[in-house]
């Protein structure tokens, strides 16, 4: 199997996006296609969550400039939202030139709409000025929304 075919097979397994984005190269791809070199910021592609007893393991997969970024986190099942957010943040770590941790991640009800909310803490600032907040509507999958809320919190810091 050549490198291009091997890469496409990996993307086919890793992506929750339609396979039409992967097959056939870059012809007709839109500028926001996460698998092209033109993607300006990391794009969420998939999140995997496995629960074993009282433990949860999350793996986040993002794409940027045609490259795949993967991050993971394992922890207590009671902290599932924070584990998913931490896995997403772990995938982004190579792109960050500052220290950041997940302060909290949760699903809130906003006038009848479920919203994923992530609060990230930069550096060791505990005054609140080092906080980044991101949100995303839950559109079916809570884990997807949590991952997108982390990207939302870091959006301005990751933009070019």
Label every PLM stretch briefly:
Residues 55, 79, 83, 141, ...:
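Conserved active-site and cofactor/substrate-binding residues in soluble primary-metabolism enzymes
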Residues 56-63, 108-136:
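Positively charged, aromatic-enriched nucleic acid-contacting surfaces
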Residues 127-160:
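Mixed-charge, glycine-accented linear interaction segment located at domain edges/termini
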Residues 84-96, 150:
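Active-site helix/loop of acyl-thioester processing domains in fatty-acid/polyketide metabolism
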Residues 1-28, 63-69:
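Intrinsically disordered, low-complexity regions
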Residues 71-78, 132-136:
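Beta-strand/loop nucleic-acid-binding surfaces
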Residues 97-105:
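Hydrophobic beta-strand-centered segment that forms part of the acyl-chain substrate-binding groove
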Residues 18-53, 57:
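Non-catalytic linker/capping segments at the edges of enzyme domains
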């Amino acid at each position: 199997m050549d490198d291009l075919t091997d890469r496409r097979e990996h993307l086919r397994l890793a992506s929750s996006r339609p396979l039409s984005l992967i097959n056939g190269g870059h012809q007709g791809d839109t500028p926001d296609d996460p698998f092209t070199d033109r993607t300006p910021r990391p794009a969420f592609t998939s999140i995997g969550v496995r629960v074993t007893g009282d433990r949860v393991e999350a793996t986040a997969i993002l794409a940027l400039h045609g490259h795949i970024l993967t991050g993971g986190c394992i922890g207590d099942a009671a902290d599932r939202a924070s584990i998913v957010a931490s896995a997403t943040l772990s995938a982004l770590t190579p792109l960050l030139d500052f220290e950041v941790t997940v302060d909290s991640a949760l699903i809130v009800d906003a006038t009848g709409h479920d919203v994923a909310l992530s609060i990230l803490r930069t550096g060791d600032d505990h005054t609140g000025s080092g906080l980044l907040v991101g949100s995303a509507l839950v559109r079916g999958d809570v884990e997807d929304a949590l991952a997108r809320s982390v990207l939302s919190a870091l959006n301005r810091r990751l933009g070019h």
